[in-house]
Amino acid sequence: AAYYKMTLNGKSITSSHLNPGFTHYDKRNLYNTYDVTSQLLKGENVLSAILGNGFYNESAPVATWSYEQARWRNRPRMICEMEILYKNGEKQTIHSDSTWKTSIGPYIQNNIYSGDTYDACLAIAGWDKPGFDDSKWTNAIQAAAPSPLLVSQNMPAIETEQFITPINMRSFGDTVYVYDFGVNMSGVCTLSINGKKGTKVSMQHGELLKLSLIHISEPTRP
């Protein structure tokens, strides 16, 4: 339940986003399947995941539909299997269990409505690639299933349709910048940052501009 980002040998196993789809998480949960044959390496392979809260563990009190009061709320959890079919016809199944290793990471807070807090100082280089030493990490804890039903997701996935660059930028001093993308859309921002360790960068999204400023009193989503 909740959202995940999964990689195999450091590369994402899918181009889609916000998986799996929404359900009443205490009644049924969706799972996704992927063909990762092209990402397998000879020798060691590393399957890794980052878990996010999604709508399963929505905590923001301003959440539409009061998801913060949902009866299914709980900490994110996952289950996965990898089926390997060899040329000789033999099949091997690798599944998640308490032998998997876990650690804190740079995503120290994440929320559908209020966004993410990412601390680059906590980023761990190479953590999802072969050769990484996870001996100091802790073992995963087996958790109860959120619901009795696990169902294959048939709905279309959320995919990136296009990349949009700002049509205008206005600065207010040397610390505040407003970028106008010229269209109301669902998406995420990408940026490259150079700065001293400990520097904080905040992004506020808005649906309207008034007097070149983000008008945050109107319905907006971060």
Label the predicted regions.
Residues 1-213, 217, 221:
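Extracellular/oxidizing-compartment recognition motifs
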